[in-house]
Structures are given as structure tokens and as C-alpha cells.
Design a protein with these regions (language model features):
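C-terminal regulatory/oligomerization modules of transcriptional regulators
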Residues: 1-10, 132-164
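N-terminal leader segment of winged-helix/HTH proteins
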Residues: 1-38, 162-164
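Charged, amphipathic alpha-helical coiled-coil/dimerization segments
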Residues: 3-4, 79-140
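Active-site phosphate/pyrophosphate-handling residues
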Residues: 14, 46, 136
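Short, locally clustered residues in the helix-turn-helix/winged-helix DNA-binding domain
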Residues: 20, 49-55, 115, 143
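Alpha-helical linker/hinge and terminal dimerization helices associated
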Residues: 22, 26, 30, 67, ...
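N-terminal helix-turn-helix DNA-binding core of bacterial DNA-binding proteins
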Residues: 24, 28-72, 84, 154-159
Length: 164
């Protein structure tokens, strides 16, 4: 027996549509600014942010978990980035099947070049439009939505570099 579908009402449709539109606008702005400030795509930037903030090489499985990506997507992305000289993959000495990935000098140069403009974009198109109360409320609401997922992330979300 199939469960009865609870269709979206007008308010819910509008809310979902707004969420999708905002997500699209944010990604488009980030992609556009990455193209002008660096030679990185948004996925490359996300990978490099995570790797550049790690204390050494990162297991491929841990990278997939941190990015909330399928392992095959991470593998393909790392392969492309290896060909571009942005990262390097090494075998895990304890486990012949496992692999580590780390940034190269070129990858670090690209992330350092892209990070300032990326942070300015995140502020301009998202954070600066909210006051402190808005940010706290949005963080509360997003945590409420995120709590419904099986989140295996063990680190902070990638995509926004921290100033070290």
C-alpha cells in the first residue's frame, strides 16, 4: 500500500521555490566570481578549501564525508584535479585499497588566489544582507532542517575558507 502524498500548499510551494532560486543565485554568483579570480570551478574550490585546512593528507572517504558527496564523485573530481596539478593522490600504506589526497603547491596557489574574492562574494550576496539576529535565526532554522538528515560530516562544511 502506498502512502498518501501530502502535496505542497501555496505557501510551501512559494517557500520551496524561493529556496531553490536563492540556492541557484548563490551558486551562479560564486561560479562567476571564481572564474574571474582564479582558474577553479566551484567543486575544485570546495575540495581545495577542505584539503588546505587539513593537517596533512586526507583519506578519500573522509573527504567524501566532509563534502557530503558520493565517493565516486570525489574520485572523479580528484582524478580531474590531479591531471590539472592541483592535488595529488597517494596510496594508503596500511590499506592497499585506501588512498589519501593532498594539495600541491599549484593547488595552494589557486586557493590562496581565489579565497579572498570568494569570501567577498559570500558576504556580498548572502551574509551582508542579514543582521546578527537574522543570522542567528537562520542558523537555528537550518540546524532544524539539517537535523532530519543522516549527516556523517565530521568537520565544518567546506566551501568557505577560514582565515588561518
Amino acid at each position: 500500500m502506498t502512502e498518501q502524498v501530502k502535496w505542497l500548499n501555496e505557501q510551501e510551494k512559494a517557500l520551496w521555490g524561493s529556496f531553490l532560486a536563492i540556492e541557484g543565485h548563490l551558486h551562479l554568483a560564486i561560479q562567476r566570481d571564481l572564474k574571474t579570480s582564479s582558474n577553479l570551478t566551484e567543486p575544485e574550490f570546495e575540495v581545495l578549501v577542505h584539503l588546505s585546512e587539513a593537517d596533512g593528507p586526507v583519506r578519500m572517504t573522509a573527504l567524501a564525508d566532509a563534502l557530503q558527496w558520493e565517493r565516486s564523485r570525489v574520485s572523479h573530481q580528484v582524478t580531474r584535479m590531479t591531471k590539472r596539478g592541483l592535488v595529488q593522490r597517494t596510496s594508503c600504506p596500511e590499506d592497499g585499497r585506501g588512498a589519501f589526497v593532498s594539495t600541491t603547491a599549484e593547488g595552494m596557489r589557486e586557493i590562496e588566489k581565489a579565497a579572498p574574492d570568494h569570501v567577498r562574494t559570500v558576504r556580498r550576496v548572502f551574509l551582508d544582507r542579514l543582521d546578527d539576529d537574522d543570522k542567528r535565526e537562520l542558523a537555528r532554522l537550518l540546524a532544524k532542517v539539517e537535523s532530519g538528515f543522516d549527516v556523517t560530516r565530521t568537520s565544518a562544511p567546506s566551501g568557505v575558507p577560514s582565515k588561518s
